[in-house]
Amino acid sequence: NEESIKVDDSFIIINYWASWCLECIEEHDLLITLAETNNLKDSVIMVSFQDNIQNSIEFLNNYGYGEIIYAVDESSKLAIESGVFGVPETHIVVNGEIVKKYIGPLNLSNIEEIINNYP
């Protein structure tokens, strides 16, 4: 079942993650905090990649849901089209264009850079 997510693409943070990824567990809380403390709830999208929906739901049940958008890319179509190398990986999208890629887990320094340099 393929559904579209309508978002304002003027500024989006897309995080690719998987339930089996230990580094994804660590950055999950950082992304939720980033979204909730910077009024970015509709701008942060966590996309489960290289995983299935059951494992993704179990991950979120174990580690919590934030007030952000969650999606599952079971076919890897979005990730492949976006040039994702693996998980975790985070893309900053401004006006529909990927302007920055963070390959590997985000840290506090990356979060500060996002807050200070992007809308």
Where do the language-model regions lie?
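Thiol/disulfide oxidoreductase modules built on the thioredoxin-like
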Residues: 62-66, 73-118
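A short beta-strand-turn-helix
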Residues: 1-12
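Structural microenvironment flanking redox-active thiols in thiol-disulfide oxidoreductases
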Residues: 25-63, 74-80
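Short, conserved active-site loop motifs that form the nucleotide-linked donor/cofactor pocket
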Residues: 42, 68-69
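Cofactor-binding loop segments of dinucleotide-utilizing enzymes, especially the Rossmann-like FAD-
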Residues: 16, 47-49, 95
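Nucleotide phosphate-binding site architecture
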Residues: 22, 32, 99
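Hydrophobic beta-strand anchors of alpha/beta hydrolase catalytic cores
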Residues: 13-14, 44, 90
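Aromatic-flanked redox-active Cys/Sec active sites in thiol-based oxidoreductases
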Residues: 15-21
